[in-house]
Amino acid sequence: MFLHSTESGWIAETPAKINLFFEVLGKRNDHFHEIVSVALPIRFFDTISFERTDEPLIQFQCIGGGEDVPMDETNLVVRAAKLIQQRFNVHHGASITLTKRIPSQAGLGGGSSDAAAALRLACRTWNLDVPDADLLPIAAELGSDCPIFFHDTPTISAGRGEQIQPLPATPPLWFVLLKPPEGLSTADVYAECMPLHDGQYRQPVTLLAALSNGDVQTIGEHLFNRLEVPAQKLWHRFGKLKNQLLQAGCLAVQMSGSGTAFFGLCRDEFHAGEILDRLTMQYPQSSFSLLEKFCSLSPHF
C-alpha cells in the first residue's frame, strides 16, 4: 500500500491481490480452513482518506462499490479505526472517505486491503507510534488475509492465512482481469470444498522458483486454486468465462481466491493490451463489471 500525508490528513492507495496458488488442507477445530496461499499484489487500487476530528466519532462515507459495500459500522475500514481507538485509548475521531474501485465478491481482497490500510492510517492520523508487528494481530482479527497487505511483495500464507512469509519482489507480471456481474459467497464455496487425503495436497515449490525469476511460462503452468472445483459446482458460467480468456490468448487463466474474478496471465504489457482489445471487441461492455489489464505491484515497474 502507498501512504502519504496531505494538508488535512492522510491518504492510502490500497492494492488488490490475486492468488497464484491456493490449497485447502482441511477444516480446523475453530471452523476456519487450513490453507496454503501465494498471493501477488497488483496495481489496482482503492483509495482511503483519513482526517482527524476533535470529537471521538468515526464518520464514514464510501464512493462507488455498489450495494455490496457496507456503509455502516460493519465496514472493515470503520471496524479497523474503532479497534485502534479502543486498543490505544484514543480520544479523537476521524472523517473517512473510501473510494471503491476493487469489486466485492471477486476474490481480490479489496475489503481486507482497505482494512489493513485503515489500521496504518488511523495510527498516523492520531499520531500513534505503533509498529506493524503490533498491528498484524489486529489485522488478523479483521480478516484472515488482511495481514498480507502489510507487504508490497508476494507472500506465502499458511494456517488460516495469518502465518505469512513475504517473498522477494518479482519482475513485473502482466494480467488481464475479468470480473462478471455475479458473485459467490465465500462460505458457500468453502462448504462445497471436499476434504483431501494425505498425499493429495499440492505444493507451490516450482511456482515459487519461477516467480523469483519472472519465468512467465512456468508460472502459468503451475497456477493452482483448489477452490475452482467447488466454485464450478455452484456457478454454471465458470467454464465459459475461463474459456473466454483462454481463447483470447492468455497463457493461463485462474480464478482468484473464492471468485468470481478471473485473471489471465500474459507475456508482457503489449500482449495484455492485445488480449484486452480482443475481448473488448468481442463482448459488450455490460458482460463484465470489470475488464482491464493490470501489472503486479513491483519495485521494478
PLM regions: where:
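Glycine/serine-rich anion-binding loops at beta->alpha junctions
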Residues: T97-W126, S144, C250-C266
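ATP-binding N-lobe of GHMP and related small-molecule kinases
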Residues: M1-A106, R124, L128-A133, T170, ...
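Short, basic/glycine-rich phosphate-binding loops at helix/coil junctions
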Residues: P56-G65, P70, A118, A140, ...
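Solvent-exposed alpha-helices and their adjacent loops that cap or buttress functional pockets
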Residues: F2-H4, P41, A140-E141, P147-F150, ...
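Contiguous, small/hydrophobic- and glycine-enriched helical/loop subdomains that border
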Residues: G93, A115, L119-I156
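Short, conserved aromatic-histidine micro-motifs
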Residues: E67, D132-H151, I275-F294
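Conserved, helical-rich catalytic subdomain that frames metal- and/or nucleotide-binding sites
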Residues: F150-H151, T155-A252, R267-G273, D277, ...
